């Protein structure tokens, strides 16, 4: 989860988020090198007293600044496409959960079970227990097994919403009349917080998401108690 005054990303808790963090560092380093080079060239141009008034063109330099950006774009595009295909790939999910966005709460349905569904509302500030987080706690958490691929089917009943859990690298639009899907797999147990990430009305800020990732044995106990 996020910490006060945090400047970086949340700790990665899924393979996809780890890949995204590596890609971010890779791209940021390229941007840093380009910015440094441009700043150096500008400084040289502003401080040098040398001029060459008879130069009309420079084929060598033009060739360099045509080929070099192409190489840089390839170095950015290849890992980006790799992660994009990884995010879309779903290999034999062990569980499927359908989530529907409403103004302003989420509803969940475990499609592998006959009667396992519930609504998830934000806990009001006056009802919070010691240690709970304001605007992030819900009355019904989404309990899922850790270290197992889970398919999320995401849609909306009314307006555009977006189902997002940053530490798992998830953000999928919930669109009325359309069913989007995403894959999640947590590498460790814990509570993972998210929020609706699409402005959807006056109470947009009051649509938190809480995933509780537990070992498979504990998930089976929980699912049995909910049926």
Swiss-Prot record:
Known EC number: 7.1.1.9
Gene3D superfamilies: 1.10.287.90, Cupredoxins - blue copper proteins
Main location: mitochondrion
Transmembrane regions: 15-45, 60-87
Location of this chain's protein in the cell: Mitochondrion inner membrane
Organism: Cavia aperea
Co-factor: note: Binds a dinuclear copper A center per subunit.
Pfam families assigned: COX2, COX2_TM
Subunit-level organization: Component of the cytochrome c oxidase (complex IV, CIV), a multisubunit enzyme composed of 14 subunits. The complex is composed of a catalytic core of 3 subunits MT-CO1, MT-CO2 and MT-CO3, encoded in the mitochondrial DNA, and 11 supernumerary subunits COX4I, COX5A, COX5B, COX6A, COX6B, COX6C, COX7A, COX7B, COX7C, COX8 and NDUFA4, which are encoded in the nuclear genome.
Biological process annotations from GO: ATP synthesis coupled electron transport
GO CC annotations on file: mitochondrial inner membrane; respiratory chain complex IV
Protein name: Cytochrome c oxidase subunit 2
Binding-site positions, Mg(2+): 198
Mitochondrial matrix side: 46-59
Functional description taken from the UniProt entry: Component of the cytochrome c oxidase, the last enzyme in the mitochondrial electron transport chain which drives oxidative phosphorylation. The respiratory chain contains 3 multisubunit complexes succinate dehydrogenase (complex II, CII), ubiquinol-cytochrome c oxidoreductase (cytochrome b-c1 complex, complex III, CIII) and cytochrome c oxidase (complex IV, CIV), that cooperate to transfer electrons derived from NADH and succinate to molecular oxygen, creating an electrochemical gradient over the inner membrane that drives transmembrane transport and the ATP synthase.
Keyword Transit peptide assigned: no
């Amino acid at each position: 989860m996020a910490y006060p005054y945090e400047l970086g990303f949340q700790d990665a808790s899924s393979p996809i988020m780890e890949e995204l963090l590596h890609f971010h560092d890779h791209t940021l380093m390229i941007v840093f090198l380009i910015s440094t080079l441009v700043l150096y060239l500008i400084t040289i141009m502003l401080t040098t007293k040398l001029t060459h008034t008879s130069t009309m063109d420079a084929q060598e330099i033009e060739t360099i600044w045509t080929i070099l950006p192409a190489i840089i774009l390839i170095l950015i595009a290849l890992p980006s496409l790799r992660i994009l295909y990884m995010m879309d790939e779903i290999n034999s999910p062990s569980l499927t959960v359908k989530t529907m966005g409403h103004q302003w709460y989420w509803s969940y349905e475990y499609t592998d079970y006959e009667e396992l569904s519930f609504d998830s509302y934000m806990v009001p500030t006056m009802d919070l227990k010691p240690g709970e987080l304001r605007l992030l706690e819900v009355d019904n958490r989404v309990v899922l097994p850790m270290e197992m691929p889970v398919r999320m089917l995401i849609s909306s009943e009314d307006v555009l919403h977006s189902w997002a859990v940053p530490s798992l690298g998830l953000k999928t639009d919930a669109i009325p009349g359309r069913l989007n899907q995403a894959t999640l797999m947590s590498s460790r147990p814990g509570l993972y917080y998210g929020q609706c990430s699409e402005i959807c009305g006056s109470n947009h800020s009051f649509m938190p998401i809480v995933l509780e990732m537990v070992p498979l044995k504990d998930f089976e106990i929980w699912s049995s108690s909910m049926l």
